[in-house]
Protein backbone atom coordinates (compact mmCIF):
# COMPACT_ATOMS: atom_id res chain seq x y z
CA UNK A 1 0.00 0.00 0.00
CA UNK A 2 1.50 3.33 -1.12
CA UNK A 3 1.80 6.10 1.47
CA UNK A 4 0.34 9.42 0.33
CA UNK A 5 0.15 12.95 1.71
CA UNK A 6 -3.34 13.83 2.95
CA UNK A 7 -2.71 17.34 4.31
CA UNK A 8 -3.71 16.48 7.89
CA UNK A 9 -3.00 19.71 9.75
CA UNK A 10 -2.58 19.66 13.55
CA UNK A 11 -3.81 23.24 14.00
CA UNK A 12 -6.92 22.48 11.96
CA UNK A 13 -7.55 19.45 14.17
CA UNK A 14 -7.20 21.59 17.29
CA UNK A 15 -9.71 24.11 15.94
CA UNK A 16 -12.13 21.23 15.35
CA UNK A 17 -11.63 20.00 18.93
CA UNK A 18 -10.33 16.61 17.80
CA UNK A 19 -7.97 16.53 20.80
CA UNK A 20 -10.63 16.67 23.54
CA UNK A 21 -11.20 13.25 25.10
CA UNK A 22 -13.62 12.15 27.81
CA UNK A 23 -13.34 12.88 31.52
CA UNK A 24 -10.37 11.28 33.24
CA UNK A 25 -12.67 9.02 35.27
CA UNK A 26 -14.26 7.65 32.11
CA UNK A 27 -11.34 6.17 30.23
CA UNK A 28 -9.92 2.91 28.99
CA UNK A 29 -6.33 2.38 30.26
CA UNK A 30 -5.44 0.85 26.88
CA UNK A 31 -5.80 4.36 25.45
CA UNK A 32 -2.80 5.59 27.51
CA UNK A 33 -0.40 5.62 24.49
CA UNK A 34 -2.81 7.91 22.64
CA UNK A 35 -3.22 10.46 25.46
CA UNK A 36 -0.77 13.35 25.83
CA UNK A 37 -2.08 15.18 28.92
CA UNK A 38 -4.87 15.81 31.43
CA UNK A 39 -6.54 19.21 31.48
CA UNK A 40 -9.40 20.38 33.71
CA UNK A 41 -10.55 16.84 34.36
CA UNK A 42 -10.42 15.58 30.77
CA UNK A 43 -7.86 13.63 28.78
CA UNK A 44 -6.16 15.33 25.84
CA UNK A 45 -5.61 13.13 22.80
CA UNK A 46 -2.17 13.12 21.18
CA UNK A 47 -2.92 14.62 17.75
CA UNK A 48 0.35 13.35 16.29
CA UNK A 49 -1.00 9.82 16.79
CA UNK A 50 -4.37 10.86 15.39
CA UNK A 51 -2.69 12.24 12.25
CA UNK A 52 -0.65 9.06 11.83
CA UNK A 53 -3.60 6.67 12.03
CA UNK A 54 -5.91 8.92 10.02
CA UNK A 55 -3.26 9.01 7.30
CA UNK A 56 -3.01 5.19 7.38
CA UNK A 57 -6.80 4.97 7.12
CA UNK A 58 -6.81 7.35 4.14
CA UNK A 59 -4.14 5.22 2.43
CA UNK A 60 -6.24 2.10 3.04
CA UNK A 61 -9.52 3.52 1.68
CA UNK A 62 -7.77 5.14 -1.29
CA UNK A 63 -6.16 1.82 -2.19
CA UNK A 64 -9.47 -0.05 -1.77
CA UNK A 65 -11.48 2.53 -3.74
CA UNK A 66 -8.91 2.48 -6.55
CA UNK A 67 -9.65 -1.26 -6.87
CA UNK A 68 -13.44 -0.77 -6.95
CA UNK A 69 -14.12 -1.94 -3.39
CA UNK A 70 -17.32 -1.13 -1.48
CA UNK A 71 -17.60 0.77 1.82
CA UNK A 72 -20.14 0.96 4.62
CA UNK A 73 -20.13 3.93 7.03
CA UNK A 74 -21.84 3.41 10.40
CA UNK A 75 -22.75 6.19 12.83
CA UNK A 76 -26.17 6.20 14.47
CA UNK A 77 -25.96 8.71 17.31
CA UNK A 78 -27.71 12.05 16.76
CA UNK A 79 -24.55 14.12 16.39
CA UNK A 80 -23.14 11.80 13.74
CA UNK A 81 -26.25 10.76 11.77
CA UNK A 82 -26.48 13.66 9.30
CA UNK A 83 -22.72 13.84 8.84
CA UNK A 84 -22.61 10.12 8.05
CA UNK A 85 -25.37 10.25 5.43
CA UNK A 86 -23.88 13.31 3.72
CA UNK A 87 -20.37 11.84 3.70
CA UNK A 88 -21.59 8.49 2.38
CA UNK A 89 -23.64 10.06 -0.41
CA UNK A 90 -20.68 12.23 -1.42
CA UNK A 91 -18.35 9.23 -1.63
CA UNK A 92 -21.00 6.84 -3.03
CA UNK A 93 -20.78 4.58 0.02
CA UNK A 94 -23.47 2.61 1.83
CA UNK A 95 -24.40 3.85 5.29
CA UNK A 96 -26.35 3.11 8.47
CA UNK A 97 -27.23 6.22 10.49
CA UNK A 98 -30.44 5.42 12.38
CA UNK A 99 -30.14 2.11 14.18
CA UNK A 100 -27.94 -0.93 13.72
CA UNK A 101 -30.25 -3.92 13.38
CA UNK A 102 -28.55 -6.90 15.05
CA UNK A 103 -27.36 -9.43 12.47
CA UNK A 104 -27.37 -6.89 9.65
CA UNK A 105 -24.11 -8.39 8.37
CA UNK A 106 -23.76 -11.73 10.17
CA UNK A 107 -27.28 -12.71 9.12
CA UNK A 108 -26.94 -11.29 5.63
CA UNK A 109 -29.53 -13.62 4.06
CA UNK A 110 -32.25 -12.07 6.27
CA UNK A 111 -31.02 -8.55 5.51
CA UNK A 112 -31.09 -9.41 1.81
CA UNK A 113 -34.74 -10.50 2.06
CA UNK A 114 -35.61 -7.24 3.81
CA UNK A 115 -33.82 -5.30 1.09
CA UNK A 116 -35.74 -7.14 -1.63
CA UNK A 117 -38.99 -6.32 0.17
CA UNK A 118 -37.91 -2.69 0.54
CA UNK A 119 -37.03 -2.40 -3.16
CA UNK A 120 -40.35 -3.97 -4.18
CA UNK A 121 -42.31 -1.56 -1.97
CA UNK A 122 -40.22 1.34 -3.25
CA UNK A 123 -41.13 0.43 -6.83
CA UNK A 124 -44.80 0.17 -5.87
CA UNK A 125 -44.59 3.55 -4.15
CA UNK A 126 -42.98 5.18 -7.19
CA UNK A 127 -45.51 3.73 -9.63
CA UNK A 128 -48.40 4.51 -7.24
CA UNK A 129 -49.21 0.81 -7.10
CA UNK A 130 -49.98 1.08 -3.38
CA UNK A 131 -52.76 3.57 -4.09
CA UNK A 132 -54.61 0.94 -6.14
CA UNK A 133 -54.90 -1.36 -3.12
CA UNK A 134 -57.68 -1.28 -0.51
CA UNK A 135 -56.99 1.56 1.96
CA UNK A 136 -56.26 -0.73 4.90
CA UNK A 137 -53.80 -2.90 2.93
CA UNK A 138 -52.12 0.19 1.47
CA UNK A 139 -51.74 1.74 4.94
CA UNK A 140 -50.05 -1.41 6.29
CA UNK A 141 -47.60 -1.55 3.37
CA UNK A 142 -46.88 2.19 3.58
CA UNK A 143 -45.99 1.82 7.27
CA UNK A 144 -43.78 -1.15 6.42
CA UNK A 145 -42.10 0.84 3.65
CA UNK A 146 -41.50 3.80 5.98
CA UNK A 147 -39.92 1.50 8.60
CA UNK A 148 -37.65 -0.18 6.05
CA UNK A 149 -36.67 3.15 4.52
CA UNK A 150 -35.65 4.50 7.94
CA UNK A 151 -33.39 1.58 8.81
CA UNK A 152 -32.30 0.23 5.41
CA UNK A 153 -32.46 3.33 3.21
CA UNK A 154 -28.71 3.86 3.41
CA UNK A 155 -27.93 0.31 2.23
CA UNK A 156 -30.67 -0.01 -0.41
CA UNK A 157 -28.11 -0.57 -3.19
CA UNK A 158 -26.02 -3.06 -1.22
CA UNK A 159 -25.88 -6.45 -2.97
CA UNK A 160 -23.34 -8.15 -0.72
CA UNK A 161 -21.14 -7.66 2.32
CA UNK A 162 -18.98 -4.50 2.32
CA UNK A 163 -15.22 -4.69 1.81
CA UNK A 164 -14.43 -2.09 4.49
CA UNK A 165 -16.56 -0.68 7.32
CA UNK A 166 -15.93 2.79 8.79
CA UNK A 167 -17.31 3.18 12.32
CA UNK A 168 -18.01 6.54 13.94
CA UNK A 169 -17.88 6.03 17.74
CA UNK A 170 -16.78 2.49 18.49
CA UNK A 171 -18.54 2.36 21.87
CA UNK A 172 -21.87 3.30 20.30
CA UNK A 173 -21.50 0.90 17.36
CA UNK A 174 -19.99 -2.04 19.24
CA UNK A 175 -22.49 -4.56 17.79
CA UNK A 176 -21.58 -3.54 14.25
CA UNK A 177 -17.88 -3.84 15.08
CA UNK A 178 -18.32 -7.33 16.54
CA UNK A 179 -20.16 -8.46 13.40
CA UNK A 180 -17.30 -7.18 11.24
CA UNK A 181 -14.75 -8.98 13.42
CA UNK A 182 -16.77 -12.22 13.19
CA UNK A 183 -16.87 -11.97 9.39
CA UNK A 184 -13.29 -10.77 8.96
CA UNK A 185 -14.33 -7.46 7.38
CA UNK A 186 -11.61 -4.79 7.80
CA UNK A 187 -12.68 -1.90 10.04
CA UNK A 188 -11.67 1.70 10.62
CA UNK A 189 -12.97 3.08 13.93
CA UNK A 190 -13.10 6.57 15.38
CA UNK A 191 -12.26 5.96 19.04
CA UNK A 192 -12.40 8.29 22.03
CA UNK A 193 -10.48 7.89 25.30
CA UNK A 194 -13.10 5.46 26.68
CA UNK A 195 -12.57 2.91 23.88
CA UNK A 196 -10.46 -0.19 23.33
CA UNK A 197 -7.95 0.66 20.56
CA UNK A 198 -7.11 -2.99 19.89
CA UNK A 199 -10.40 -4.07 18.25
CA UNK A 200 -10.51 -2.33 14.87
CA UNK A 201 -7.93 -2.81 12.10
CA UNK A 202 -7.20 0.92 12.19
CA UNK A 203 -8.26 2.94 15.24
CA UNK A 204 -8.27 6.74 14.89
CA UNK A 205 -8.08 8.42 18.33
CA UNK A 206 -10.34 11.49 18.23
CA UNK A 207 -13.17 13.33 19.94
CA UNK A 208 -16.30 11.37 19.01
CA UNK A 209 -18.75 13.85 20.58
CA UNK A 210 -18.00 17.12 18.76
CA UNK A 211 -19.64 17.59 15.36
CA UNK A 212 -16.60 19.50 14.06
CA UNK A 213 -14.28 16.63 15.04
CA UNK A 214 -16.45 13.95 13.41
CA UNK A 215 -16.78 16.12 10.29
CA UNK A 216 -12.99 16.58 10.08
CA UNK A 217 -12.31 12.83 10.21
CA UNK A 218 -15.08 11.99 7.74
CA UNK A 219 -14.01 14.70 5.29
CA UNK A 220 -10.49 13.28 5.11
CA UNK A 221 -11.72 9.72 4.60
CA UNK A 222 -14.30 10.78 2.01
CA UNK A 223 -11.71 12.77 0.08
CA UNK A 224 -9.40 9.72 0.00
CA UNK A 225 -12.26 7.46 -1.18
CA UNK A 226 -13.24 9.93 -3.92
CA UNK A 227 -9.61 10.19 -5.07
CA UNK A 228 -9.40 6.41 -5.16
CA UNK A 229 -12.62 6.13 -7.15
CA UNK A 230 -11.29 8.67 -9.69
CA UNK A 231 -8.15 6.56 -10.06
CA UNK A 232 -10.29 3.43 -10.57
CA UNK A 233 -12.35 5.12 -13.32
CA UNK A 234 -9.23 6.43 -15.09
CA UNK A 235 -7.62 2.98 -15.07
CA UNK A 236 -10.75 1.05 -16.12
UniProtKB/Swiss-Prot annotation:
Pfam families: Ribosomal_S2. One of its GO terms (biological process) is translation. One of its GO terms (molecular function) is structural constituent of ribosome. One of its GO terms (cellular component) is chloroplast. It is found in: Plastid, Chloroplast. Its main location: plastid. Gene3D superfamilies: Glucose-6-phosphate isomerase like protein, domain 1, Helix hairpin bin. It comes from the Eukaryota. Signal peptide: none annotated. Keywords: Chloroplast, Plastid, Ribonucleoprotein, Ribosomal protein. PANTHER family: 30S RIBOSOMAL PROTEIN S2 PROKARYOTIC AND ORGANELLAR, SMALL RIBOSOMAL SUBUNIT PROTEIN US2M. NCBIfam families: rpsB_bact (TIGR01011). Belongs to the universal ribosomal protein uS2 family. HAMAP family: Ribosomal_uS2_B. This is Small ribosomal subunit protein uS2c. It comes from Aethionema cordifolium (Lebanon stonecress). The lineage of its organism: Eukaryota, Viridiplantae, Streptophyta, Embryophyta, Tracheophyta.
Amino acid sequence: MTKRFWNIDLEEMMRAGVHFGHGTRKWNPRMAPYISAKRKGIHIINLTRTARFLSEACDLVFDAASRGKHFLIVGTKNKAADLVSRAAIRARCHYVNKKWLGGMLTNWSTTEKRLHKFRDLRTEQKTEGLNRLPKRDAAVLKRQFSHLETYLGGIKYMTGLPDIVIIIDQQEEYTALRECITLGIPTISLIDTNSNPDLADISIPANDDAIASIRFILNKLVFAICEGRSSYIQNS
